[in-house]
Amino acid sequence: MIASLRGTVINIGLSSAVIECNGVGYEVVTTPNTLSQLVRGEEALVL
């Protein structure tokens, strides 16, 4: 299990976001509240 993820937000969907870390894109399924705080192209830390 992954406990945290830090990287660049490369895509934001209706129920998930893709965060790129060291060249690997991770799809993170999360709440609408968390998705609303993410900005495409900026760094994010998801816990």
Task: Describe these PLM feature segments.
Residues 1-47:
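A positional/architectural concept
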